[in-house]
């Protein structure tokens, strides 16, 4: 299951203040704390989810990285790696809320259970494509930055010839109990950050993290009819899990470049059809562009600006559509510019002949004049 947006998890806006974040987290943590819901797996998951969200958004640097890159921008090891890491995410929880839970909840549910397992973070990749590519679909390669297990230590974080040792603080459980009077609360071990292991001699290649940053190349199939903002999920191609946890997923988010001619609206396409005023007056045959080539369109006599011609099935067949949409051509009658004296004289003669014919040549103008007179009367 993909990770939810951290702001959504806490139920706050993206511009929420630190105080708003803290209040939202307090409320969720108190509601879903395992000691209050001892037999609810769902409450336990929601508690962990809220804790993870606050630990990222409550940290200025991590929040900035998350706002820019999503889950991929947050160091996946921050959720708890070996002793080679500089600081985990559990400490903030203990500092800010240990006193609250110590006062509210009784003895914890369990004393151990082994190292904590974390699902890998999801990755987001923005892919810009053309409208033509979106309509037809295609296969492409993308290079995605990701954390991979270190080739030197094979993910252990320990120097060659050594191995991680059982954490002395938690005895390998990954958690410790804090006693406050008659109450106790279980927290992530501050020494091993939930792994249950300590690395006393870290791997020089990865500094004890157990992972290195590198690019991986993936094949992605873009389906025909995909629309702007849609996401393609590639299961298991996100960040690797921690302590044997499952990997996250990769989400390829589609961004369609602005087209020179067409604007997309669902499965339909729209375009402006600029025609000379002579063609608008006399009518004629025109060729209009479509994504599949050219199409003929008949312009009737007396066509006005704003008239729309509909070309059926000349739009896009959506990802889930059975039939393609339509193409709507919106007429714009072009007024000639930079006329010669001779052309101006011809137009004045033409104007005089129109005036001799009365309102029958300009029905819209007559209607507009009547509305103006009524407005001022």
Swiss-Prot record:
Compartment(s): Cytoplasm
An example Gene Ontology biological process: response to heat
GO terms under cellular component: cytoplasm
Keyword Zinc-finger appears in the UniProt entry: yes
Main localization category: cytoplasm
Domain J residues, every copy: 5-70
CR-type zinc finger segments: 137-215
Binding site for Zn(2+) 2: 167, 170, 189, 192
Annotated CXXCXGXG motif repeat ranges: 150-157, 167-174, 189-196, 203-210
Cofactor requirement: Zn(2+)
Amino acids binding Zn(2+) 1: 150, 153, 203, 206
GO molecular-function terms, A-Z: ATP binding; heat shock protein binding; unfolded protein binding; zinc ion binding
Free-text comment on the cofactor: Binds 2 Zn(2+) ions per monomer.
InterPro entries given in the database record: DnaJ, DnaJ_C, DnaJ_domain, DnaJ_domain_CS, HSP40/DnaJ_pept-bd, HSP_DnaJ_Cys-rich_dom, HSP_DnaJ_Cys-rich_dom_sf, J_dom_sf
Role description: Participates actively in the response to hyperosmotic and heat shock by preventing the aggregation of stress-denatured proteins and by disaggregating proteins, also in an autonomous, DnaK-independent fashion. Unfolded proteins bind initially to DnaJ; upon interaction with the DnaJ-bound protein, DnaK hydrolyzes its bound ATP, resulting in the formation of a stable complex. GrpE releases ADP from DnaK; ATP binding to DnaK triggers the release of the substrate protein, thus completing the reaction cycle.
Protein family (similarity comment): Belongs to the DnaJ family.
Subunit structure: Homodimer.
Domain notes: The J domain is necessary and sufficient to stimulate DnaK ATPase activity. Zinc center 1 plays an important role in the autonomous, DnaK-independent chaperone activity of DnaJ. Zinc center 2 is essential for interaction with DnaK and for DnaJ activity.
Protein name: Chaperone protein DnaJ
């Amino acid at each position: 299951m993909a990770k939810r947006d951290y702001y959504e998890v806490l139920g706050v806006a993206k511009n929420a203040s630190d105080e708003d974040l803290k209040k939202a987290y307090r409320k969720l943590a108190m509601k879903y704390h395992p000691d209050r819901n001892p037999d609810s797996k769902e409450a336990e998951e929601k508690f962990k989810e809220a804790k993870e969200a606050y630990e990222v958004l409550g940290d200025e640097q991590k929040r900035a990285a998350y706002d820019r890159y999503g889950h991929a921008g947050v160091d996946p090891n921050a959720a708890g790696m070996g002793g080679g890491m500089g600081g985990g995410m559990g400490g903030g929880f203990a500092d800010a809320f240990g006193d609250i839970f110590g006062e509210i909840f009784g003895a914890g549910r369990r004393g151990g259970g082994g190292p904590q397992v974390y699902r890998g973070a999801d990755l987001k990749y923005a892919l810009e494509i053309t409208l033509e590519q979106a309509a037809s679909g295609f296969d492409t390669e993308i290079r995605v930055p990701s954390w991979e297990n270190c080739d030197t230590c094979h993910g252990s974080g320990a120097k060659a010839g050594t191995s991680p040792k059982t954490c002395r603080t938690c005895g390998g459980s990954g958690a410790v109990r804090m006693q406050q009077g008659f109450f106790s609360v279980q927290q992530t071990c501050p020494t091993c950050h939930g792994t249950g292991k300590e690395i006393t001699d870290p791997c020089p290649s990865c500094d004890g993290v157990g992972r290195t940053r590198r690019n991986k190349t993936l094949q992605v199939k873009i389906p025909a009819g995909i629309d702007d903002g849609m996401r393609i999920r590639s299961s298991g191609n996100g960040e690797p899990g921690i302590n044997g946890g499952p990997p996250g997923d990769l989400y390829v988010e589609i961004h369609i470049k602005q087209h020179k001619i067409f604007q997309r609206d669902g499965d339909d396409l729209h375009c402006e059809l600029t025609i000379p005023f002579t063609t608008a007056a006399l009518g004629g045959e025109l060729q209009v562009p479509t994504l599949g080539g050219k199409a003929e369109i008949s312009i009737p006599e007396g066509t006005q600006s704003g008239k729309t011609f509909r070309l059926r099935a000349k739009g896009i067949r959506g990802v889930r559509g059975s039939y393609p949409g339509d193409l709507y051509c919106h007429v714009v009658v072009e007024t000639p510019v930079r006329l010669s004296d001779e052309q101006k004289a011809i137009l004045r003669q033409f104007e005089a002949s129109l005036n001799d014919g009365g309102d029958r040549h300009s029905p819209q103008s007559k209607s507009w004049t009547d509305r103006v007179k009524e407005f001022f009367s």
